[in-house]
Amino acid sequence: NDLADINNDGWVDVITLDMLPKDEAVIKTSAAEDTYEVYNFKLKYGFHKQVSRNTLQLNQGALNSGEVLFGDIAGVSGLESTDWSWAPLMVDLDGDGWRDIFVTNGIVRRPNDMDYISFISSDSVQRLENVVPWIAQMPEGKVSNFAFRNKGDLTFEDKTVDWGFSLPSFSNGVAYSDLDNDGDPDLVVNRINETALIYRNNSDPGRFLKVIVYGDTAGGNRYAIGATVTATQGDQTQTHEIFPARGWC
């Protein structure tokens, strides 16, 4: 998951990922979440309602009671399905002042493929002494990562192809940093069984503000972890929190 302000209201929002496929064919050939019996069993023992899809929890601010209210808007935002996903990053990739969303994707094998489950569960396969060769027949899940442009109205546009992220891979961790000091964030993506990817951001950031934050060296927080930087212009407030890790590492 990742935490950042996606609508510039000063409140930190939350995105969490699951594994709802984007491709209709993959949806139809994948085993769904728990059966109704298992679903109710989990509810009985205190688990919350489980649905296999992404969520984007919009922070709606503090109530009169002091509690903070969140609401899931992933469905209306266009972010609820990104397949077998791992790390989301909420970061302004195109320099328009709104945080976009990048999602790493892919799994080496899809153990929930229903055709494969049916095949491997058959008596003829189960009677074999060595099933290792058949495990290799499990379908792979090499898919592209996703990039979504924040349109500024709580909806996102899929820019995966336009922004150059259409390469299928098994990607996990991702980090962003301005590697070439040109004002826009570049991406480093970790992949399974392959070299890492480095994506140079070629957008034109125009004017940008660079802030250096110093922490309390004596107190052991040299890099100011946990610090918050806010910039306000008109009715827009951009909030950035400093943490050494985001998404899924």
Range-by-range predicted roles:
Residues I27-E37, V51-G71, M114-S118, K142-E157, ...:
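Beta-propeller blade repeat segments, especially FG-GAP/WD-type strand-to-loop junctions
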Residues Y36-H48, G71-T82, V131-V132, P139, ...:
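Short loop/turn motifs that recur once per blade in beta-propeller domains
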Residues D2, S52, W84-W86, V143, ...:
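Beta-rich catalytic cores
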Residues N1-N8, L58-N59, W86-G95, N172-D180:
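Beta-propeller blade termini
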Residues E140-F146, N150, T155-S171, A175-C249:
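Gly/Ser/Thr/Pro-enriched helix-cap/hinge segments flanking short amphipathic alpha-helices
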Residues D18-L20, A62, I107, N193:
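Residue-level signature of beta-propeller blades and closely related beta-rich strand-turn architectures
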Residues P21-H48, I107-P139:
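Short, conserved, GDST-rich strand-edge loop motifs in beta-rich repeat architectures
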Residues V14-L17, I101-N105, D182, D186-R191:
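Hydrophobic beta-strand segments that make up the repeating blades of beta-propeller
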